Amino acid sequence: DGRLKAPGKLSSLTPEYGQCAGSNQSPVNLSGLVKADLAPLQFHYQAGGKTLVNNGHTVQVNYAPGSTLELDGMHFELKQFHFHAPSENLIEGRSYPLEGHLVHANDKGELAVVAVMFEPGQANGALSQAWQVLPAKAGEIHAFKEPISAEQLLPAQHDYYRFSGSLTTPPCLEGVRWLVMKEPVQASQAQIDAFKAVMHHPNNRPVQPLNGRLVLE
């Protein structure tokens, strides 16, 4: 699977990797930060995590309809969240041991991804619940007894960095609104290690060039 063996050379593999050689790719090293009057993010989340799937390149929680993010005067519905270890994005050169991506879409199909950095510390409530049924093998899918709330993945402060980027896995679709939380959240080292154990390999795409894109804060 090329996604696992050559995450940095996705564009050269097959046609479905179409935009992976584009100039607005993710992840990035968030640097050269530009002060901007970014509107506060408005999260309207409810407990909606239904199933947990190991798709071979991440572990993903699929979310029931009804949880939204208000951004740019539009409602973006939370579709799923998943994880990367180590982090894909860097904040001024700093890597974190784990990064969560909360993937949202509006009714036009436009995407907004909220990225949350994890640092070792206290156990995270959402991960405690999810990892009880952590699927060990690619293709496994497990249902939760009780729905999980993505709100437990968010930091207390919702200050963020913003840039325009892409999906970090094929087809590397560009035009994605990226919102990277400034404040990290905590996960226990055991939680981080459990994710890494089922992945068997780092699942972060290498940092892509900014190519003149601005990172707003």
Each predicted region: which residue ranges?
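Alpha-carbonic anhydrase
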Residues: 1-217
